């Protein structure tokens, strides 16, 4: 942030015109009345006047926040890190991120969006614009400030990551203009992926239950035995804490299908197929040690109808695939000890131990 504290105001003075005012006004109209919206990486406030009120101006640079506050004193000003938002669950009604998340490393963006999903209310609009392309580093040609980190994105991969983070991308909104890619999305009543580089194992459920979606973590029902089995297997250290499971132990989590339902029986064959393709792209990108599918229904629907629990002959995204029985309390045929054994073996396949 020293770069922005030292040179940010000079850059802001030459970029004071809000070139996307109509998009900002359209975003403001989509935020529910009286709901708080947040300008992520507000800088000197180029778009803040057009986002509606009440508004949070959020930036990591105190110098930029001071300049913004002097021009627009009616907003709430918060200094912080876009990857660690200091807000409570469901407290924000909309998020505007214009050329902000492009400063987050590609393999860390899923968790930054997981945190954004956490603080946004269900149905909250989210608009994001980032750099288009494959560049990642701090020596971008044309960087007028100099020394800033940038991460470019292909449109299809950005759409996958946003969808995986629990957002419904609006049809036709994913677009490229010059060297920029942008999209509009809505925070869904579902779970966000907890994924990143260096995963020993990626756990893939069938789809979130409404109970888990509202709780903010997978396998959240008291009768579900996933977390007791994972703790007993020694692959996590905290109960029902997917972020800690990833960051402290290398266990990521996603789902075949992002749509939350009361029961997995509501998931359609087309949803399984679409979801499998998304998970395969995710695995090919992040290359976890292994992928453990919890519940056989998705794998049997898409890959092999006669599949049995255990290490599969087929890989996914070039990585080993392990399929295990459902951990639901309704699956009385499989004991906690058996579930623990499956998780331990899948973990070993992924290189854990």
Label each residue range with its predicted role.
Residues 131-149:
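Short, glycine-/aromatic-enriched active-site segment of Class I SAM-dependent methyltransferases
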Residues 123-130:
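Conserved beta-strand signature within the Rossmann-like core of class I S-adenosyl-L-methionine
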Residues 96-97:
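A conserved beta-strand element that flanks and buttresses the S-adenosyl-L-methionine
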